[in-house]
Amino acid sequence: MFTCKVNEHITIRLLEPKDAERLAELIIQNQQRLGKWLFFAENPSSADTYRETIIPDWRRQYADLNGIEAGLLYDGSLCGMISLHNLDQVNRKAEIGYWIAKEFEGKGIITAACRKLITYAFEELELNRVAICAAVGNEKSRAVPERIGFLEEGKARDGLYVNGMHHDLVYYSLLKREWEGEK
């Protein structure tokens, strides 16, 4: 199954049922922060639901070549997630999503993991385009694609509905030729 070493501290890997307790715990601990922008944090699933349903679904999704929902590990400890979703192999494109627990912010984990997943998308999956979208008000999430060199394409007005509120989304993209030019 999918495991990708980013550097000596960071690993991206598919979650296993044994990760369910830690995942549920992280989401609950960060619920107020994550719930502003991510629907799943509004009413977090239980560890049992992650173990019995959600994690097995994510593993099937990967096996069926429909995307990657993976854990982010820092020094072996689960600290967040990263995904390659809306995978469209016909048009050779996908989107990246991510979140991280507050205690792990500021260590460059998300940026490094995104760079690794982008390389994987372009080199292994032979995609041509990777996109990231973030709520206009989610400055920390928006900083990631801006730091990496994504191009801001535009906004989707009221493109996100979470916590009973609509939020505008900013869309960013990076093309394979741009990524190769950065190296």
Curated annotation (Swiss-Prot):
Known EC number: 2.3.1.-
Enzyme class: transferase
Pfam family, one: Acetyltransf_3
Family matches, as InterPro entries: Acyl_CoA_acyltransferase, GNAT_dom, Ribosomal_N-acetyltransferase
Bilayer-crossing regions: none
Gene Ontology MF terms in the entry: protein N-terminal-serine acetyltransferase activity; protein-N-terminal-alanine acetyltransferase activity
Cellular component, GO, one term: cytoplasm
Domain N-acetyltransferase: start-end pairs: 10-176
CDD domains in the cross-refs: NAT_SF (cd04301)
Superkingdom, natural source: Bacteria
UniProt keywords, alphabetically: Acyltransferase, Transferase
SUPFAM superfamilies xrefs: Acyl-CoA N-acyltransferases (Nat)
Known role: Putative N-acetyltransferase. May act on ribosomal proteins (Potential).
Family label: Belongs to the acetyltransferase family.
UniProt subunit comment: Homohexamer, and homodimer.
The protein's name in its UniProt record: Putative ribosomal N-acetyltransferase YdaF
Organism per entry: Bacillus subtilis (strain 168)
Gene that this sequence comes from: ydaF
